[in-house]
Amino acid sequence: MKKLTLSTILLATVFSFAVFTEVKAQAVSVNFSVFQQELSPYGRWVNSPSYGQVWIYNDVNFRPYYTDGHWEYTNYGWSWESDYDWGWAPFHYGRWEEDPYYGWMWIPGYEWGAAWVSWSSYDDYYGWAPLGYGLNVNISFGS
């Protein structure tokens, strides 16, 4: 019985490392100055009448949570793993809004999240969309 229990614990431990990727929230304290310094080389800051200072990436073809990155399942759930040097900030803090004039703009926020998106599915298809500023998440079950 002792061998079975030990084997079960060992197997569960190995399985947990195989299934999940370790992702940790940023241990550093973030503020607007940090975002401004880190993101300025890659885009521009503009004053939005609705949100204040927002950041716009230089590539007009950019789409958040779609361009240059991938989804990875972690111990926090699905997390966006960005290939951009600056991706640690806008994909895990703040929210994205699509502006008719500027295109995608990032609104700074100070709470870390694995990804600020809303998920949907139909049959074997899955989709996601960035959560806009001030939106809440609702969960529903059914067919």
Predicted regions and their residues:
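Low-complexity segments
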Residues: 27-143
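Classical secretory targeting signals
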Residues: 1-26
